[in-house]
Amino acid sequence: MLSLSHYLVLGAILFAISVVGIFLNRKNLIVLLMAIELMLLAVNLNFIAFSHYLGDLAGQIFVFFILTVAAAESAIGLAILVVLFRNLRTIHVDDLDSLKG
């Protein structure tokens, strides 16, 4: 039987992996978006673990809202990436410092 601490440790490990992914890879926007999504999933795992441990459904309902926002964020982020790649032929963060007006 897995206890609450097992889920919290797994959530902390996933969160730490995503933070390391953000700090180590600041060049590629797709990898940055994937690291942010992994961070949100780690937070969702903690919400579900606490919700199950406390016997309350509020945490699980909150996870559905977070997943909805994460899906919208991914769709908008990928749409922005497609537009940037069409215009600039790159998705590296260093090359996105110029603004058109």
UniProtKB/Swiss-Prot annotation:
Superkingdom, taxonomy of origin: Bacteria
| Name of the featured protein | NADH-quinone oxidoreductase subunit K
Q: TM spans, by residue?
A: 4-24, 30-50, 61-81
Q: Mind telling me which PANTHER family this protein's record contains?
A: NADH DEHYDROGENASE SUBUNIT 4L-RELATED (PTHR11434:SF21), NADH-UBIQUINONE OXIDOREDUCTASE SUBUNIT ND4L (PTHR11434)
Q: Name its species.
A: Aromatoleum aromaticum (strain DSM 19018 / LMG 30748 / EbN1)
Q: What is the lineage of its organism?
A: Bacteria, Pseudomonadati, Pseudomonadota, Betaproteobacteria, Rhodocyclales
Cross-referenced HAMAP family, in alphabetical order? Answer: NDH1_NuoK (MF_01456)
Membrane topology designation? Multi-pass membrane protein
Write out the function statement from the record: NDH-1 shuttles electrons from NADH, via FMN and iron-sulfur (Fe-S) centers, to quinones in the respiratory chain. The immediate electron acceptor for the enzyme in this species is believed to be ubiquinone. Couples the redox reaction to proton translocation (for every two electrons transferred, four hydrogen ions are translocated across the cytoplasmic membrane), and thus conserves the redox energy in a proton gradient.
Cell compartment(s), UniProt: Cell inner membrane
Q: Which UniProt keywords apply?
A: Cell inner membrane, Cell membrane, Membrane, NAD, Quinone, Translocase, Transmembrane, Transmembrane helix, Transport, Ubiquinone
Provide the Gene Ontology terms for cellular component.
NADH dehydrogenase complex; plasma membrane
Q: Which gene encodes it?
A: nuoK
